[in-house]
Amino acid sequence: MAQADAPLSIVGAERGWILLLVLAVWSYDTGAYLVGKNFGRTKFLTHISPSKTIEGLVGGVVATTVVVAVMLLGLGQNPLHALILGPLTALAAQAGDLAESVIKRAAGAKDSGTIIPGHGGMLDRVDSFIFAAPVVTLYVLALVR
């Protein structure tokens, strides 16, 4: 399918890639949370973030890869790129979340703010994007376009 004929061509290529990034990170967070909460048994990196599980990590990677594949189809790109871009984006999102946890621990804070009640603060809302955005950008510029 040509890019001009792609279902998401109506939003424009740049907006489509931004939407891919946002949905990929959200799908990682959601997949990791749901799988970790329901099936998580094997804890990892508990000294940084006590609730992280390997099962949650895998669930997040799978969710991200599926969403990235669907988005790539919508953008008129080869969905096989999702086999690389999905896990890379998921792991970058996890790294951003863990980096923010390290900063909070070093500061002796449970949350990074109170502006959004129940969500740990503004930094918790963007931590995954800080690491995932450069990964998606570099991948797309180097290999997709």
State what each model feature region is.
Residues 1-132:
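Interhelical loop and helix-boundary elements at the membrane-water interface
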Residues 138-145:
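Juxtamembrane boundary at the C-terminal end of a transmembrane helix
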Residues 132-133, 145:
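C-terminal-most transmembrane helix of multi-pass membrane proteins
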